[in-house]
Curated annotation (Swiss-Prot):
Keywords: NADP, Oxidoreductase. This is NADP-specific glutamate dehydrogenase. Signal peptide: none annotated. Gene3D superfamilies: Glutamate Dehydrogenase, chain A, domain 3, Leucine Dehydrogenase, chain A, domain 1, NAD(P)-binding Rossmann-like Domain. GO terms for cellular component: cytoplasm; cytosol. Homohexamer. InterPro entries: Aminoacid_DH-like_N_sf (IPR046346), Glu/Leu/Phe/Val/Trp_DH (IPR006095), Glu/Leu/Phe/Val/Trp_DH_C (IPR006096), Glu/Leu/Phe/Val/Trp_DH_dimer (IPR006097), Glu/Leu/Phe/Val_DH_AS (IPR033524), Glu_DH (IPR014362), Glu_Leu_Phe_Val_DH (IPR050724), NAD(P)-bd_dom_sf (IPR036291). The active site is at 128 (proton donor). SMART domains: ELFV_dehydrog. The lineage of its organism: Bacteria, Pseudomonadati, Pseudomonadota, Gammaproteobacteria, Enterobacterales. GO terms for biological process: glutamate biosynthetic process. It comes from Salmonella typhimurium (strain LT2 / SGSC1412 / ATCC 700720). PANTHER family: NADP-SPECIFIC GLUTAMATE DEHYDROGENASE 1-RELATED.
Length: 447
């Protein structure tokens, strides 16, 4: 494309290339809209078709996964691995198992992952993978057979210096273990390229907690910069999985009163706030095969909002930790009307573009996921470092490194985020991540 093309021309070009990939187009629009003024002031980043290369994955692998269920019936699923950008290191990003998974979602996640990984300052490129397989309601044997069948194709595309997957929605420590074990068997190599592994075979302490902890570390830094803090604040958390659970734990440790959790069926509201004991029980319920927050609400006699999200509950801080596009413009209006002071994304792109714009216009502090939830991949990078050195660090060391990385990410966002009075963290995160990747791509030539 012409280096003098407009933002809309560029976005139309992306849309025409993949007209049905709405999630990917949304992610590109969100990033490029904030980048464009910076690009106009720094035209060297328009050379050598850098932007066109940046929005095109280096490689997309699509394949079928054939496996046997418990009834000995043949099942067929689709799987993908999007190896988006390796300019600053091996592809790094999770594997997602969910019926909604498609190429558009994985491209959006891989695109976001590229900038997120760059923000950590660790040498990791961006990638993402997954399948439309649904682990819910499956037996452990079925999950194992699916994971092993998937790896018979995927293993040939992975390696510690090539592509290092991890977990995501539907992929926890159990699934990572099954995939890493099959990878070891097929490759005849014990390097176990996955991160998020069990502690018994190369995993890192604090890795399960890292995304939730990192979210709270980043949010606390953002609040402190603007004269606020978690202490005494009412907090709404969406989701009840790994990220939500550890975000609740760390927010409580910082003195917040967390009043909600949710799942796809509804929201539990606890006006007195979570306690460590209540959170432990929620984690137990969610770890069971069919555990729902409705069960938790009944057990403790709490308010349950069936089919609703948490955003109607008046709070000071909102932490969306469930899934993409869960917080739309209508929910944003309600939060703003109820006096929300800060929103920080624990999930990947949980806030729609329109809702994000509304928060920024209203002066609400807003932390985008590529910065706020980078703690998970940052600690995966630390796991890779421990594996390479054949060492295992104590939890305190990993947590301290994670906290330091999140503060560094916050500093980078502030550096590129505009005026000192009210930092635009969306702009700051996008520009900071872009500059790191773009400089590496330009230095390596047209490849």
């Amino acid at each position: 494309m012409d280096q003098t093309c407009s933002l809309e021309s560029f976005l139309n070009h992306v849309q025409k290339r993949d007209p049905h990939q709405t999630e990917f187009a949304q992610a590109v629009r969100e990033v490029m809209t904030t980048l464009w003024p910076f690009l106009e002031q720094n035209p060297r980043y328009r050379h050598m078709s850098l932007l066109e290369r940046l929005v095109e994955p280096e490689r997309v692998i699509q394949f079928r996964v054939v496996w046997l269920d418990d009834k000995n019936q043949v099942q067929v699923n689709r799987a993908w691995r999007v190896q988006f950008n390796s300019a600053i290191g091996p592809y790094k990003g999770g594997m997602r198992f969910h019926p909604s998974v498609n190429l558009s979602i994985l491209k959006f996640l891989g695109f976001e992952q590229t900038f997120k990984n760059a923000l950590t300052t660790l040498p990791m490129g961006g990638g993402k993978g997954g399948s439309d397989f649904d682990p819910k309601g499956k037996s452990e044997g079925e999950v194992m057979r699916f994971c092993q069948a998937l790896m018979t194709e995927l293993y040939r595309h992975l390696g510690p210096d090539t592509d290092v997957p991890a977990g995501d929605i539907g992929v926890g420590g159990r699934e990572v273990g099954f995939m890493a074990g099959m990878m070891r068997k097929l490759s005849n190599n014990s390097s176990c390229v996955f991160t998020g592994k069990g502690l018994s075979f190369g995993g890192s302490l604090i890795r399960p907690e890292a995304t939730g902890y990192g979210l709270v570390y980043f949010t606390e830094a953002m609040l402190k910069r603007h004269g606020l803090g978690f202490e005494g604040m009412r907090v709404a958390v969406s989701g009840s999985g790994n990220v939500a659970q550890y975000a609740i734990e760390k927010a409580m440790a910082f003195g917040a009163r967390v009043v909600t959790a949710s799942d796809s069926s509804g929201t539990v509201v606890d006006e007195s706030g979570f306690t460590p004991e209540k959170l432990a029980r929620l984690c137990e319920i969610k770890a069971s095969r069919d555990g729902r927050v409705a069960d938790y609400a009944r057990e403790f006699g709490l308010t349950y909002l069936e089919g609703q999200q948490p955003w109607s509950v008046p709070v000071d801080i909102a932490l969306p930790c469930a899934t993409q596009n869960e917080l739309d413009v209508d929910a944003a209006r309600v939060l703003i009307a109820n006096g929300v002071k800060a929103v920080a994304e624990g999930a990947n792109m949980p806030t729609t573009i329109e809702a994000t714009d509304l928060f920024l216009e209203a002066g609400v502090l807003f932390a985008p996921g590529k910065a706020a939830n980078a703690g998970g991949v940052a600690t995966s990078g630390l796991e890779m470092a421990q594996n390479a050195a054949r060492l295992s660090w104590k939890a305190e060391k990993v947590d301290a490194r994670l906290h330091h990385i999140m503060l560094d990410i916050h500093h980078a966002c502030v550096e590129y985020g505009g005026d000192n009075k009210h930092t635009n963290y969306v702009q700051g995160a996008n520009i900071a991540g872009f500059v790191k990747v773009a400089d590496a791509m330009l230095a390596q030539g047209v490849i």
